[in-house]
Regions:
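A structural signal for short, well-ordered beta-strand segments and their strand-loop junctions
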Residues: 20, 39, 458-460
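Glycine-rich, aromatic-lined ligand/substrate-binding cores of catalytic
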Residues: 437-471
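Conserved small-residue
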Residues: 107, 330-438, 476-478, 497-499
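Extracellular/periplasmic, surface-exposed regions of secreted and cell-surface proteins
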Residues: 1-36, 50-378, 517, 521, ...
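C-terminal beta-barrel architecture of Gram-negative outer-membrane proteins
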Residues: 457-532
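Glycine-rich, charged/polar anion/phosphate-binding loops
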Residues: 251-253, 431-434, 441-446
Length: 601
């Protein structure tokens, strides 16, 4: 249930002054029922010519869960907007807001001796379970004040200052409130007479320079850590024949924990030429976050006997740029537009709470402060072993004198030249997928649209780059966990009938235990995950109104569209938009096709 009540008042005694009141209440109730039946699978034994049965999901069971959540929000604001002397435009906002959110849940589970009735009352009382998900039981309240003043002079000089003063119930008294100011300025240089009245520059329709700086607070990473508490159940203990569940100590409270601050600086420009025939937007940005939560490492001995609390210790920095280029034109009845975008973002750990380095090598190898978060460590690659002789004359890399190595195995680089392949030969030579915000380092795309005499077409391309994917488990080696092998492992090192090794793309097949020599992350098994995808295409035709109005239809458009039509990528088994699928268990991306019409009377 979602409800919203809004009331607006315009003051008759002062031009431009208005007040607005808003109250919203949302309530959700979620009921879940899972009935899991016991089933039997049969596996054929070729040698004995029999089918062996195995029972799964035994015994049958039923799970019921009830969840409810409520959220309310109140806003009250004063707005003042006025144009003075046809030149000075002033807008002022002052707003008060508060919100509260709470959730609760309960679940139960029973096993069945007979599963004819799929209701929880029909289950067995023996070994029944009832509980609640602790992460879905909470109550949070926020309050805040917002102020904003916006001024522009003839749409040429623009300025805005604002602030937020926010409070959160998640923090202790004295640390609940945070003040977060921001400001921005803009200068439409195209409105200056030396451009508007200078004929050689008449092609400049709009040129705006802008800069902004703002601070924001975030309380989402902490919940009531200033309170002492317990986790239940903790460890269990046996006294006599009875098992008693215990309480687990949550750790030391921290009454000083508070908002972490995010400070963002943005500098950019907007440019339109020839009435929008060409356009460009360029932005450079820096976002510095201070007070990220972390636990002290190495400063407090483990003999303290308690888990340390989180504190506002860590810092990071996002920086990058974004470029958007556009072109639109009309040639007789043909209209078209093209938009291209490219962005590069990297995240750097400015300070990461970690123990002191033992030496300079330990600092280089194991510490992450002042380093980019997308930096990945791996062995360098010298290809594959081509023969047993090649293995014997190369540094040992399995720790067993080469006893588990075979031709076709990955040949790791002896990076430090000590004749031994170990962890000391790992170095930063790959890029992880993400900047910790779910996006690759580079993103790019294109939007193309065209229209001609009622026909229209729209295309959306999307891509990413600057990151790698490494295959694991069933994509990395055959017979994983005693299962089968995927078809791409046919292209592997193998022996012919005379015992000669035939080269292949993958190492030779053997049992998983002796395959572990090929598990290590190395450049050879690290794939460039850059991609370009045709995300969507839509083609439509709008029937002329002089035809549709005969049938009392104002507008009729017929269309067909498709999504995820093709992808250009070096990855064969993983969707580059979801590189977390590098274990091979995610459902492949689907192509979707739709046909329909838009009708209005």
């Amino acid at each position: 249930m979602n409800t919203t009540f809004t009331l607006t008042y315009k003051a008759p005694f002062l031009k431009g002054l208005s007040a607005k009141f808003l109250y919203a209440y949302d309530y959700k109730n979620y009921q879940q029922k899972e009935f899991q039946k016991q089933y039997t699978l049969y596996k054929y034994d070729r040698e004995k010519d029999v089918y062996n049965s195995q029972i799964y999901s035994s015994p049958s069971s039923i799970y019921r869960k009830s969840w409810e959540g409520a959220q309310n929000q109140l806003q009250a604001s004063l707005n003042y907007e006025r144009l003075f002397a046809e030149k000075h435009n002033l807008k002022v906002l002052f707003l008060y807001e508060q919100s509260a959110k709470e959730e609760d849940n309960l679940w139960a589970k029973r096993n069945f001796e007979m599963d004819a009735v799929d209701e929880i009352f029909a289950g067995s009382e023996e070994e029944q379970i009832g509980n609640a998900d602790a992460g879905q039981i909470y109550r949070v309240t926020n309050m805040g004040l917002v102020g904003r003043v916006n001024y522009d002079y003839q749409s040429k000089y623009l300025a805005e200052v604002s602030f937020r003063y926010d409070g959160s119930s998640k923090f202790a008294k004295g640390h609940r409130w945070g003040f977060f100011p921001s400001a921005s300025v803009g200068y439409r240089i195209s409105e200056e007479s030396f451009i508007k009245e200078f004929a050689p520059l008449s092609f400049i329709t709009n040129w705006k320079l802008r800069a902004s700086y703002g601070a924001m607070g975030d309380d989402g990473s902490s919940s009531y850590q200033y309170l002492s508490g317990y986790d239940y159940p903790g460890a269990s203990y046996v006294f006599g024949d009875v098992v008693y569940k215990g309480l687990g100590f949550r750790g030391l409270p921290n009454e000083l924990i508070t908002w972490y601050k995010s400070k963002t600086l943005n500098v950019g420009t907007d440019l339109d030429l020839w009435n929008g025939m060409l356009s460009a937007q360029v932005d450079f940005f820096w976002r510095y976050r201070d007070g990220l939560l972390g636990k002290r490492s190495g400063e407090v001995p483990g003999t303290i006997g308690a888990e340390l609390p989180e504190e506002n210790l860590n810092q990071d920095l996002y920086k990058g740029f974004e470029i958007v280029l556009g072109h639109r034109n009309k040639i007789n009845d043909f209209n078209y537009s093209v938009s291209l975008n490219f962005a590069l973002t990297r995240r750097q750990n400015r300070h990461l709470e970690e123990g002191d380095a033992v030496n300079s090598y330990d600092r280089w190898r194991n510490k992450y402060s002042n380093r980019y978060s997308d930096m990945g460590w791996a062995y360098g690659s010298n290809g594959q072993f081509t023969s047993m002789e090649d293995i014997w004359r190369s540094p040992i890399q399995d720790g067993q004198g080469g006893a588990t190595q075979l031709p076709g195995d990955w040949k790791y680089e002896d990076w430090n030249g000590d004749g031994i392949i170990d962890d000391s030969d790992v170095y930063p030579n790959v890029y992880e997928h993400t900047n910790d915000n779910g996006n690759p380092k580079m993103t790019f795309g294109a939007t193309i649209a065209a229209e001609w005499k009622g026909f229209d077409v729209n295309l959306l391309f999307q891509g990413g780059g600057g990151f790698n994917v490494i295959y694991f488990e069933q994509l990395q080696y055959p017979l994983c966990f005693g299962g089968n092998g995927l078809a791409h492992f046919y292209d592997r090192y193998r022996q012919d009938e005379n015992g000669n090794w035939i080269p292949g793309k993958w190492p030779t097949t053997r049992d998983a235990g002796s395959y572990s020599v090929n598990y290590a992350r190395c450049k050879q098994t690290t794939y460039d995950a850059s991609y370009l995808r045709l995300k969507s295409v839509e083609i439509g035709y709008t029937i002329p109104q002089h035809i549709t109005r005969k049938f009392k239809v104002d507008r009729l458009r017929i269309f067909a569209n498709g999504y995820n039509l093709f992808t250009l990528s070096n990855l064969d088994f993983v969707d580059p938009e979801h590189p977390e699928g590098n274990y091979g268990y995610l459902y492949p991306i689907m192509r979707n096709f739709n046909f329909g019409l838009n009708l209005s009377f």
